[in-house]
A protein has these predicted regions:
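An active-site-proximal "capping" alpha-helix that borders the catalytic cofactor pocket
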Residues: 83, 170-175
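Generic structural "secondary-structure junction" signal
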Residues: 18, 159-161, 172
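Terminal peptide-recognition signature
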Residues: 1, 138, 175
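Intrinsically disordered, low-complexity linkers and stems that provide flexible hinges
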Residues: 1-52, 57
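Juxtacatalytic substrate-recognition/specificity segment
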Residues: 45-167
Length: 175
């Protein structure tokens, strides 16, 4: 997939694998990987860190004027290290924590990334910040428990029919 950026937009962040030597070009191993990889294009607020040679991106898109990205990235790094301590290793080539700054919160795990939503005060009040971090940590842990160790119904998907998962309570409960 090649992305052509409008001149005012400077960044593309996605869990997809970049194609070496080809700017703004990404590849997916299969259709499931493609549709499981959110893409943020624009001028987001980003911070990065590396653990075990693996790039981690902490990104906020939207009204980021009140977001403390340095604080968030430092705490996300602690979450990654804690999860690594529990699970033994990091099972992905790189990871993207993509957060849309909106009015409500929530999130969804992806194989090599997280797409979440949070309010603009997420890093300004203790309660909002703990809510943001706990959702992010929960969805990040799904990288092991749900994306790699999963009920058979969770992949590969049947895109022609609804997919019902009778054991999702186990995956969510263990997380």
């Amino acid at each position: 997939m090649k992305v052509e950026l409008p001149s005012a937009w400077k960044k593309i962040e996605t869990p997809l694998e970049p194609v070496a030597g080809s700017a703004n070009t990404y590849r997916a191993a299969d259709f499931d990987t493609l549709v499981d990889s959110p893409i943020i294009i624009g001028n987001p607020l980003t911070r990065e860190f590396v653990i075990d040679g693996k790039r981690h991106v902490v990104l906020f898109e939207g009204d980021t004027s009140l977001i403390d990205a340095d604080k968030a990235a430092a705490d996300v790094q602690k979450i990654v290290n804690a999860a690594k301590g529990v699970m033994g290793s990091l099972v992905y080539p790189h990871y993207h924590f993509l957060t849309m700054v909106v009015e409500q919160g929530g999130g969804l795990e992806h194989k090599n990334g997280y797409l979440g939503m949070t309010g603009r005060f997420a890093t300004r009040t203790h309660g909002a910040y703990m809510g943001f971090l706990s959702t992010l940590a929960h969805e990040f842990f799904h990288n092991w428990n749900v994306k790699r160790l999963r009920p058979v119904e969770l992949g590969p998907f049947d895109y022609e029919n609804e997919n019902y998962v009778k054991t999702l309570w186990v995956a969510e409960g263990f997380t």
